């Protein structure tokens, strides 16, 4: 079986993003309406606690990266390729955060199925292939993963600090 072309791999990054955000889109409202330990520990920012706003944010978090992916396919440039691979790093780190959320919750958390079954293995495949085929150096992959991890931790910290600032003193 011939290897997938780079453009096909980039398009599949978009497809995995769509699958993942679709799972979240369909399951977040029930998740937000349920009382659970995770929401007490790391609540979403106030503006995302409304299911309608959450859905709008999920659509934007899908459409904008898809535009970058399409641009990278139609107008191949190194910066666009790195941007799409950074998106893949974000999806990979996000898979870890979904596993953490499911563990804290003691069960299902929105997005965990696609994160574990699709984004995690596909992310590893894409990044290994990017290094093997010299799309970008391994050092750059590790830097992108590090930046994605810092952004995830910062998002958690902002949510936690926002919650702390609203607690009665």
Please place each PLM-identified region on the residue numbering.
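N-terminal signal-anchor transmembrane alpha helix
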Residues: 3-26
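Membrane-interfacial loop-to-transmembrane alpha-helix junctions, especially the N-terminal start
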Residues: 7-10, 79-87, 138-141
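Aromatic-anchored segments of alpha-helical transmembrane domains
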Residues: 21, 90-97, 149-156
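Cytosolic, membrane-interface loops and tails of multi-pass inner-membrane proteins
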Residues: 28-47
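Core segments of transmembrane alpha-helices
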Residues: 55-72, 91-94, 119
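Membrane-interface helix caps and helix-loop-helix hairpins in membrane proteins
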Residues: 77-78, 99-110
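Hydrophobic alpha-helical membrane segments
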Residues: 89-98, 111-129
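Terminal transmembrane helical module of multi-pass membrane proteins
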Residues: 125-169
